[in-house]
């Protein structure tokens, strides 16, 4: 497995791959000052290697890189994560230590389901979503391309729109539209992002 991006997020993915017995072949990063990460070589040009995981935490940058590379993508799922056999996980997605993904949940491409996050039954997680550590998505929640902050709770049957940023510790009790910054308990829209 190759990684694109040599930063802190890549270190966690390396740990996941090693714990899963998956060989890390190397990393690629645009920064010419980085030559290695955790003992693995870092190159600065992409020459078609695959499979790949984009090891960049920023959702929009992850999307831009995926659209630019157009290669085959793998997945990284830590052995301590609990996944229902009916859950679907898209290519390029990372599921970290202690995460739980329940029955009939559908997680899109290039997502991050971070440490201890809980994605309950029938949730639909769009491409490029980041569910931060210990966030809880109750049943039948829909999220599109957004960043869900650490410790956030979303009650059942709600939607968070595309490209939102939800602040840490928020409690979402009503639908959130596209392109907003929102946080609080209860979660409130602070401003529109686009």
Indicate residue ranges for each PLM-predicted region.
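Glycine-rich hexapeptide-repeat left-handed beta-helix
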Residues: 1, 115, 124-127, 132-194
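Hydrophobic, well-ordered beta-alpha structural blocks that scaffold small-molecule cofactor pockets
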Residues: 1-45, 93
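Short alpha-helical
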Residues: 8-11, 60-61, 171
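Short amphipathic alpha-helical segments
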Residues: 14-16, 64-68, 107, 177-178, ...
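Phosphate-bearing ligand-interacting subdomains
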Residues: 32-84
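Redox-cofactor binding/interface segments in oxidoreductases and associated redox assembly factors
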Residues: 52-55, 95, 183
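Hydrophobic, well-structured mid-protein blocks that either form specific transmembrane helices
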Residues: 70-122
């Amino acid at each position: 497995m190759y990684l694109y991006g040599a930063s802190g997020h890549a270190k966690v993915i390396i740990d996941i791959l090693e714990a899963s017995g998956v060989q890390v072949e190397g990393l690629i990063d645009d920064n010419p000052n980085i030559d290695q990460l955790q003992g693995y070589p870092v190159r600065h040009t992409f020459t078609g290697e695959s499979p790949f995981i984009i090891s960049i935490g920023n959702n929009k940058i992850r999307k831009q890189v995926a659209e630019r590379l157009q290669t085959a993508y793998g997945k990284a799922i830590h052995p301590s994560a609990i996944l229902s056999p009916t859950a679907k996980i898209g290519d390029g997605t990372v599921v970290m230590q202690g995460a739980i993904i329940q029955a009939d949940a559908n997680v899109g491409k290039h997502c991050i389901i971070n440490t201890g996050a809980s994605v309950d039954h029938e949730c639909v997680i769009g491409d490029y979503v980041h569910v931060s550590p210990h966030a809880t998505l109750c049943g039948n929640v829909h999220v599109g391309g957004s960043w869900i902050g650490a410790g956030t709770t979303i009650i059942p049957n709600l939607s968070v729109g595309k490209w939102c940023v939800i602040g840490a510790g928020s409690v979402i009790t009503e639908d959130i539209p596209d392109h907003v910054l929102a946080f609080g308990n209860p979660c409130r829209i602070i401003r529109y992002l686009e």
